[in-house]
Amino acid sequence: MIQNESRLKVADNSGARELLVIRVLGGSKRKTGNIGDIVVCTVKQATPGGVVKKGDVVKAVIVRTKSGARREDGSYIKFDENAGVIINADKSPRGTRIFGPVARELRENDFMKIVSLAPEVL
């Protein structure tokens, strides 16, 4: 569960390394987000020469969380870190590569480009 002020690692090669969550999108009372949710973030750390710079406000989709996501069959999936992928307005990733595994729930939320670029879908 990701909330305001949560820090996310970046799982793509857009140039950002760490994000700070400003807002979880999806309603005025929405407090937390899980895998597949879109969040508004600011870039806290960035690599030199990247597409995004430190201080940029971007939208990202959550691809991994430490707190588990419950699936329809009753199983849970948990990861070792909280991570996100920076996206454009049309839900396509800003980077050209995705690092690390992503959850199968992204396929249900129409993030097919991220799923196809990911090395492993759990």
Swiss-Prot record:
GO MF terms held by the record: large ribosomal subunit rRNA binding; structural constituent of ribosome
Keywords of this entry: Ribonucleoprotein, Ribosomal protein, RNA-binding, rRNA-binding
InterPro entries documented for this protein: Ribosomal_uL14, Ribosomal_uL14_bac-type, Ribosomal_uL14_CS, Ribosomal_uL14_sf
CDD domains per record: Ribosomal_uL14
GO biological process, one term: translation
Presence of the UniProt keyword Ribonucleoprotein in the record: yes
Pfam families (UniProt xref): Ribosomal_L14
PROSITE patterns recorded: RIBOSOMAL_L14
GO cellular component, one term: cytosolic large ribosomal subunit
Stated role: Binds to 23S rRNA. Forms part of two intersubunit bridges in the 70S ribosome.
Subunit-level organization: Part of the 50S ribosomal subunit. Forms a cluster with proteins L3 and L19. In the 70S ribosome, L14 and L19 interact and together make contacts with the 16S rRNA in bridges B5 and B8.
Family: Belongs to the universal ribosomal protein uL14 family.
Matching HAMAP family: Ribosomal_uL14
Protein name (record): Large ribosomal subunit protein uL14
Organism: Lactobacillus acidophilus (strain ATCC 700396 / NCK56 / N2 / NCFM)
